[in-house]
A protein has these predicted regions:
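Active-site machinery of serine-nucleophile hydrolases
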Residues: 1-26
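Short, proline-enriched alpha-helix->beta-strand connector loops that line the catalytic pocket
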Residues: 5-9, 87-93
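Gly/Ser-rich "nucleophile elbow"/oxyanion-hole loop immediately N-terminal to the catalytic nucleophile
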Residues: 19-50, 60-63
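Short beta-strand immediately N-terminal to the catalytic nucleophile in serine-hydrolase-like folds
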Residues: 45-47, 72, 96
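Hydrolases whose catalytic domains are alpha/beta-hydrolase-1, hotdog thioesterase
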Residues: 54-58
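A conserved short beta-strand
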Residues: 64-76
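C-terminal catalytic histidine-bearing segment of alpha/beta-hydrolase fold enzymes
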Residues: 94-96, 100-162
Length: 162
């Protein structure tokens, strides 16, 4: 519930056998938007680890098609080209990472957020860096009880639409 209005989510969790590109994710988005009753102004992309990287990569090419992204310990190298597309489309971003992640460096998240904010993205790109070891930032990020500014990640997403 956001603003006293209730919403329902359709959650699609594709499992790719190889590293997915933004184009691979777009095939999934297009398939489900053509088959299910989905509000095209409220498509949100999130993922963890490789999926978090896919969220960054998708947004770096198709930012105009989605309402917000929430990458979690996203494994994607920061590029100015992708950051420009995200910033130019004013795509809301809330990224999560553990500072002691031993699989995907927190520098991926820091790089994107710092670059986006240096481009004066509106709204300002947000990140939550947990003081924690290991790769699992998703248990906390996706928890209904973890909130910042009185919003969990789902409530945060729902405040945005295209």
């Amino acid at each position: 519930t956001v603003g006293e209005k209730s919403f329902s989510f359709i959650v699609v969790s594709p499992q790719f056998k190889t590293w997915p590109s933004g184009d691979d994710v777009d095939v999934v988005v297009n398939y489900f938007t053509s088959k299910l009753r989905i509000d095209p102004t409220r498509i949100y992309i999130t993922g963890l680890s490789m999926g978090g990287g896919a969220a960054w990569d998708y947004a770096g090419k198709y930012a105009s098609k989605i309402a917000a992204i929430a990458p979690v310990c996203g494994a994607s190298s920061t590029t100015e080209a992708k950051a420009k597309i995200i910033a130019n489309n004013k795509l809301p971003v809330w990224a999560f990472h553990n500072d002691g992640d031993d699989r995907v460096s927190v520098n991926h998240t820091l790089g994107y957020i710092n670059m986006l904010n240096s481009m004066n993205i509106t709204p300002k790109a947000k990140m939550t860096i947990y003081a924690a070891a290991g790769h699992d930032a998703w248990s906390k990020a996706y928890s209904l009880t973890y909130k910042e500014n009185d919003m969990n990640v789902y409530e945060w997403m729902l405040q945005y639409h295209r």
